[in-house]
């Protein structure tokens, strides 16, 4: 069945060239997110009407970034920029089905948590040959949040873990979550009249990412220490990844006339290791995309595009790294809309600041 829901990632950017050498930028984006729910009859869905919880395993994660950047342009070629990042995170995870054993019926919910980080980068351009290159580093951001946790299976009378869960839930502590650091490299150059080639390479430090809610962690440690999960004697995480993610996109863009332009691109993503979490059961992807851009006047444009993804096959595991299933032959489609305006004659596009999150 289809377990992935539709979701969108809005992005907005504003750049003001305050003086010949100094600029200010404001960027809003949603760097990470998830929206998925299992349905139908499977080991990820609880259909037993006797139990006090029903439905399918699901995850919803929302993050938002507001970036305030300051740029210094010593000449027409170089741009040095850095700034602060205000980030919010909230999420819901519901585990359902026999796959999760004693965690069947577990709920994890957070309110919106706020934290601050930073980013910095450098850009270089040669306008005469349409060359633009930039490197942007985004630092990790740590969040500490009070989360709601509930172990639904232990509400069943005579459940053997009910006394232990009662002890665990009588205390509480902060749940820590750190969104990963990343590096973006963008490059563009003219290859013939009105035609450019472009490329992007991105690295995300997912191998250090983990989510272990406080009460979830305490129960997992008990299970590991009592040899109930022999391969995890120190407990396990609700979500973690084995490897860092590397992705790349290459393409060609062409200006057909004063009003119309277009592009085609090919993309590849390594994923973050295999096996993967049941809450995001894919290992990377290949993609192809195309887009068009219409400029009714010199000072604004409208762009649209579509991209098709072949999602990588993956073996899914639970937090305890027990086998949960194999996911194969999956795909996805993405649509994009882009609108831009130039407010002054020396206003330049915020490409030098761009950090696709």
Task: Indicate where each model-derived feature is located.
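Surface-exposed strand-loop-strand hairpins of Gram-negative outer-membrane beta-barrel proteins
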Residues: 1-6
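Outer-membrane beta-barrel porins/channels
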Residues: 8-11, 17-357
């Amino acid at each position: 069945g289809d377990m992935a829901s539709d979701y969108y990632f809005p992005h907005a950017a504003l750049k003001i060239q305050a003086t010949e050498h100094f600029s200010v930028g404001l960027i809003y984006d949603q760097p990470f997110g998830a929206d998925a729910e299992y349905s139908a009859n499977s080991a990820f869905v609880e259909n037993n009407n006797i139990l006090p919880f029903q439905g399918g395993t699901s995850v919803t994660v929302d993050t938002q970034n507001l970036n305030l950047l300051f740029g210094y342009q010593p000449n027409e070629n170089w741009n040095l920029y850095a700034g602060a990042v205000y980030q919010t995170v909230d999420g819901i995870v519901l585990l359902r089905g026999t796959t999760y054993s004693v965690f069947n019926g577990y709920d994890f919910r957070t309110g919106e948590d706020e934290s601050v980080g930073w980013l910095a980068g450098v850009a270089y351009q040669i306008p005469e040959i349409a060359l633009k290159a930039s490197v942007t580093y985004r630092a990790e951001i740590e969040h500490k949040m009070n989360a709601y946790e509930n172990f639904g299976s232990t509400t069943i009378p005579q459940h053997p873990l009910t006394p232990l869960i009662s002890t665990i839930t009588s205390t509480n502590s902060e749940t820590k979550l750190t969104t990963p650091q990343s590096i973006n490299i963008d490059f563009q150059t003219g290859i013939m009249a009105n035609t450019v080639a472009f490329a992007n390479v991105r690295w995300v430090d997912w191998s250090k990412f983990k989510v272990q809610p406080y009460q979830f962690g305490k129960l997992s440690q008990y299970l590991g220490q009592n040899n109930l999960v022999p391969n995890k004697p120190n407990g396990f995480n609700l979500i973690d990844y084995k490897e860092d993610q590397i992705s790349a996109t290459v393409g060609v863009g062409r200006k057909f006339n004063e009003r119309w332009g277009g592009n085609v691109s090919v993309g590849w993503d390594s994923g973050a290791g295999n096996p993967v979490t049941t809450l995001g059961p894919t290992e990377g992807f290949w993609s192809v995309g195309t887009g068009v851009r219409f400029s009714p006047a010199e000072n604004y444009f409208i762009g649209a595009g579509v991209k098709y993804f072949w999602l990588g096959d993956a073996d899914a595991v639970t937090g305890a790294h027990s086998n949960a299933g194999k996911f194969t032959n999956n795909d996805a489609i993405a649509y994009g809309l882009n609108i831009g305006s130039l407010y002054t004659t020396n206003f330049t596009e915020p490409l030098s600041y761009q950090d696709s999150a």
